[in-house]
C-alpha cells in the first residue's frame, strides 16, 4: 500500500518537473510567455515567475529524488523477501566439479601425462 502511494507521488513529481521545466523561460527566449508566464508577472511579484517556477521546480526535483530512494528501498526489501521464500542462497550453493575423464583415448606411441596440467606439454623430440 505504501509502495503504491510512493509510486503515485513519484509519477506526479516526474510529470510536474517536466511541465515546470517546459514552462520556464530560457535565456533570451520568450517561450514561457506563450503559456501565460509573461502575463502573470504581476501575480507573482516584481521578479515575475522565474523565481517562483525555479524554486518550485527545485522542490519537485528534491521530492522526485526522495521518492526514488524510497522506491529503491522497497525494491531491496522485496528482493530480500524473495530470497527467504525458499530459494537457496547462491553464496551457499556448492559447485560440483565433474571428475577428470580417465577414459580419454591415448594414441599409440604416446605415453599419458604423469600429472594432469592445465597447460599442454610440447611433445618430446627423439
Swiss-Prot record:
GO CC terms, sorted: plasma membrane
GO biological process terms, semicolon-separated: intracellular protein transmembrane transport; protein secretion; protein transport by the Sec complex
Compositional bias segments (type: Low complexity): 112-126
Keywords, comma-separated and alphabetical: Cell inner membrane, Cell membrane, Membrane, Protein transport, Translocation, Transmembrane, Transmembrane helix, Transport
Record field: transmembrane: 2-22, 55-75
A single GO molecular function term of this UniProt record: protein-transporting ATPase activity
Location(s) in or outside the cell: Cell inner membrane
Pfam families in the record: SecG (PF03840)
Region (Disordered): 103-126
Segments forming a coiled coil: none
Endpoints of the signal sequence: none
Membrane topology value: Multi-pass membrane protein
Main location: membrane
Protein family per UniProt: Belongs to the SecG family.
Main function: Involved in protein export. Participates in an early event of protein translocation.
Protein's recorded name: Protein-export membrane protein SecG
Taxonomic lineage of the native organism: Bacteria, Pseudomonadati, Pseudomonadota, Gammaproteobacteria, Pseudomonadales
